[in-house]
Design a protein with these regions (language model features):
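Alpha/beta catalytic cores of group-transfer enzymes, especially the acyltransferase/condensing modules
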Residues: 128-152
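ATP-binding N-lobe of GHMP and related small-molecule kinases
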Residues: 1-99, 103, 111-129
């Protein structure tokens, strides 16, 4: 069982300058800080070989493409886990509060799935040894693959 704990964040200045429509044409700068509220992601083997997702909504699917939670589906595909996993997400604060919860979930999930893959393959190498690579992959999933209107 792998458990990740990822802090939520609060923005102080520069909101909007981290959106692609702005930073691709000019310079953007944002001041954020992590707070002491977290999103926890638990990843473990499923008992039946299916994909189990337990968030505010519960899903159990045989095929990864049937997973409705788009961030989870794309993170699983990105790290190459297509079945046999249970994912549980618990947050200190509900989504939609402006504290970056979707991005926090994406980072925490990618990190946990990477560690889970490493344990399953009995490997000493984690996919994400560099936090910048983890952040870039999380942005790629949310912004490029899912077209989420979020900042970078």
């Amino acid at each position: 069982m792998i458990i990740s704990k990822t802090p939520l964040r609060i923005s102080f200045a520069g909101g909007g300058t981290d959106l692609p429509s702005y930073y691709k044409t000019g310079y953007g700068a944002v001041v954020n800080a992590a707070i002491d509220k977290y999103i926890y992601v638990i990843v473990k083997d499923s008992f039946d070989g299916k994909i189990h997702l337990r968030t505010t909504e519960n899903e159990v699917v045989d095929n990864i493409n049937d997973l409705k939670h788009d961030i989870t589906r794309e993170c699983l595909k990105h790290v190459g886990i297509l079945s046999g996993v249970e994912i549980i997400s618990i947050a200190d604060i509900p989504g939609g509060t402006g504290l970056g919860s979707s991005s926090c979930y994406t980072v925490g999930l990618l990190n946990a799935l990477s560690a889970f893959n490493s344990v399953k393959k009995n490997s000493q190498t984690l996919l994400y040894t560099n936090p910048s690579v983890l952040a870039e992959d999380a942005c790629m999933i949310e912004i490029d693959k899912l077209s989420a209107p979020i900042g970078k």
